[in-house]
Amino acid sequence: MKPIVAIVGRPNVGKSTLFNRLTQSRHAIVEDQPGVTRDRLYADTEWNGRTLTLVDTGGIQLDKEGDTIEAHVTRQAELAIREADVIIFVVDVTDGVTAPDLEVADLLRRQRKPVIVAVNKVENLKREDEALEFWALGLEPLINVSAEHGLGTGDLLDAVVAALPDLSEPEPEEGGPVRVAVIGRPNVGKSSLVNAILGEERVIVSDVPGTTRDAIDVLVERGEDKFLLIDTAGMRRKARVEEAVERYSVMRALRAVERAQVVLIVIDAQDGVTEQDQRIAGYAHENGKACIVVVNKWDLIEKDDRTMAKMTEEVRMRLAFMDYAMIHFVSAKTRARVHRLLPLIKEAAANHARRISTRELNDLVREAVALNPPPSDKGRRLKIFYATQPHVSPPGFVFFVNDSELVHFSYQRYLENQLRQTYAFEGTPINLYFRTREKAKLGERPVRVRRVLAGGQTREIRRAARKRSTE
């Protein structure tokens, strides 16, 4: 499970610039104006072999209360602090230690978490001397950086990695419970769905503390089958408490998805698939999880004999990047069709972990090629020598070919469709990789690997030539 690192501080100290520098991106809007970053942004980065999720937050203004935008942003940042494993506290050397800095430092000190003070805009010796003033915050270590110019960011990431806790999640045990995450935007009925599942089954073994801080995992049994509903803390609460948790729960959703085998993506039948639904579904897709789109509040829809088919078409169109996902219609309020969810979850989990023997796989490939030979490209034709399945969860297949550049996306889709038609892969993504073996100099076997991604994009990895053994 990837650790979460929150970048926090008062407004206009360079948090978003630092976020962009550390993630080598332009995710955050950067303007010289306090309060520009109102919503938390997320991006993964890797340093010294560790992958971590960086969170960019809006400026903390503890003197703001009520329903103002500033108060909303501060509450958001405070939630990020509570959920983070390590905190980067950004201050501005040109302003010196301010009263708001001291207030934020006091807030962070109470969290009892690793805090790294990033003294920003330190670009010369004079400012290095001025940065010493920030020892008054009572937090360490202090790292001098210039987010704009990239100075000191390597030292900052070194300090972050050194402070990271071990969040390794044990692999699901064979015969153990299926891990299920329930995600979706606010007010689509996630909490009602969880309660409906629990009420339907009526057999709750226990509330199991999860690895995520303050998370509650609920173990549900149905006959011999076990399901672990991940991180239901806050999801089952009511009224104002539920509203607050729902509104600021994206970080929890990210972690729940990482821990899950199957993800339930809950959407509101009245709204259809929104852009926010697409983004949330993308979290599960990018993590290679088995997915079920749960269309909730179906009882509120006026229906005819085509209503469900039309909604299914809309879901398929709006979530075209995950056309493998199962779709299920429910009413959490009336519990209609909720009883069918656990069997679907069990099926999706089994498909996600499905392995095909090398012999069966190559028989299928030979039949597929005989039925529909690869097209030629400028007189050259793709040849598939053999295939193997190196991993599951999600299933991944490697095809050894004469030249991976000859693999057209349409033929990759054809092979994927043949796999899906022959074997049960409903609900799970499958990855196809194409590996080239080229003619090489004596004693070498260079290998070029090309992965065909959704949408026809390709990613090529050139591996160093491997020496043949001469002994």
From Swiss-Prot:
Gene3D superfamilies: 3.30.300.20, P-loop containing nucleotide triphosphate hydrolases. One of its GO terms (molecular function) is GTP binding. Signal peptide: none annotated. Residues 3-168, 178-353 form the EngA-type G domain. GO terms for biological process: ribosome biogenesis. Keywords: GTP-binding, Nucleotide-binding, Repeat, Ribosome biogenesis. InterPro entries: AAA+_ATPase, G_ENGA, GTP-bd, GTPase_Der, KH_dom-like, KH_dom-like_a/b, P-loop_NTPase, Small_GTP-bd. GTP 2 binds at residues 184-191, 231-235, 296-299. Associates with the 50S ribosomal subunit. Belongs to the TRAFAC class TrmE-Era-EngA-EngB-Septin-like GTPase superfamily. EngA (Der) GTPase family. This is GTPase Der. It comes from Symbiobacterium thermophilum (strain DSM 24528 / JCM 14929 / IAM 14863 / T). The gene is der.
